[in-house]
Amino acid sequence: MGCASAKHVATVQNEEEAQKGKNYQNGDVFGDEYRIKPVEEVKYMKNGAEEEQKIAARNQENLEKSASSNVRLKTNKEVPGLVHQPRANMHISESQQEFFRMLDEKIEKGRDYCSEEEDIT
C-alpha cells in the first residue's frame, strides 16, 4: 500500500483557470446586481429647498421652546431631583486617609529633594 498523498497529481493551472481564480479573488465574478448603480431621484430628494425651510422653521420653534423652558427652570431656586447631594455613605479606608494626609503635606512643603536634582530649563 502506498501513501495517499503520493497518488495526487500536481497540475499547473492554465491561463483561463488562473484568470477565473483571480476574478473570484477580486470579486469580478459577481453579476451586475452587486455593481455600483447610479442614484435614482426619489421623493425625499425633490423639493429640497422647501423641505429645508420647513425643517429650519421647526428647529427654530423647538429652540425657542427649549430656551423658554430653561428660563423657567433657572427662575426656580431649587429644582428637586436635579441637585446632586454629596455622598453620605462613602467609605474611605484609613490607608486612603493616610495617603491623602501625606500628599497634602508634600504639597505644603513644596519640591522634594528628588525634584530639586532635576534641572528644569
UniProtKB/Swiss-Prot annotation:
Q: Give the source's domain of life in one word.
A: Eukaryota
Q: Note whether Phosphoprotein occurs among the keywords.
A: yes
Membrane-crossing segments per the record:
none
On this chain, the residues bearing Phosphoserine are 95, 115
Where is the stretch described as Disordered? 1-28, 60-82
InterPro entries, sorted: DUF4612
Q: Is Zinc-finger there in the keyword field?
A: no
What keywords were assigned to this record?
Phosphoprotein
Q: In which tissues is it expressed?
A: Expressed in spleen, prostate, testis and uterus.
Pfam family name, one: DUF4612
Classification via PANTHER family: SIMILAR TO RIKEN CDNA 1700025G04 GENE
Q: What is this protein called?
A: Uncharacterized protein C1orf21
Native source organism of the sequence: Homo sapiens
Q: Which gene encodes it?
A: C1orf21
